[in-house]
């Protein structure tokens, strides 16, 4: 699906994301970083932070622990972009997820999108 965003850029995502407020912990080599998923799909997420996070590197893959109301889901996410000028947030593309966690994530997204 391609459509224009408010900024006028073409959307590249194939699967639309839904707006959420789910806690996320990112595991790094130096410890963990807590954030919040602002939007998510089964293919990726935008994660917001209370302050600027400098110790995450573009194109690097991190372990993400996503806490929905129903489940804790583990995915490996590649950091594909960083937006620090408006809101401390980063975009992740999911590169590895078990079938079980993918099913849990899909179920949580479907349930949350009906609210």
Regions flagged by a language model, labelled:
Residues 46-49, 85-95:
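Short, solvent-exposed secondary-structure boundary/capping segments
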Residues 22-27, 58-72:
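Short conserved beta-strand and strand-loop elements enriched in small hydrophobics
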